[in-house]
Amino acid sequence: MNYLETQLNKKQKQIQEYESMNGNLIKMFEQLSKEKKNDETPKKISSTYIKELKEYNELRDAGLRLAQIIADEKQCKIKDVFEEIGYSMKD
């Protein structure tokens, strides 16, 4: 066997290993989905997560705008408004 054939055989074995690993991961995903009674695909789960994250960010931004309005009215920092209502400035 020459060098190219040896390399080709190695690559073919790697491809077979990767295909086997992919099959095992798919089986594991299906098993875990059954255990969790979750029929959603990974794509649907991530799109739901992104949608909820966007909604969270919009609500957080609205809250920050309200806190800024209150701070402007009181002529103080937003930090002072948060401390007054018992929230920390951490996100």
Swiss-Prot record:
Keyword vocabulary terms for this entry: DNA damage, DNA repair, Meiosis, Nucleus
CC per GO annotation: condensed nuclear chromosome; nuclear chromosome; Swi5-Sfr1 complex
Gene Ontology BP terms: meiotic DNA recombinase assembly; reciprocal meiotic recombination
Induction profile: During meiosis.
Superkingdom of source: Eukaryota
Subcellular locations according to the entry: Nucleus
Xref: InterPro entries: DNA-repair_Swi5
Pfam families (UniProt xref): Swi5
Assembly behavior: Forms a ternary complex with DMC1 and MEI5.
Described purpose of this protein according to its UniProt entry: Involved in meiotic DNA-break repair. Required for the recruitment of DCM1 to meiosis recombination hot spots.
Protein family (similarity comment): Belongs to the SWI5/SAE3 family.
Protein name per Swiss-Prot or TrEMBL: Pachytene arrest protein SAE3
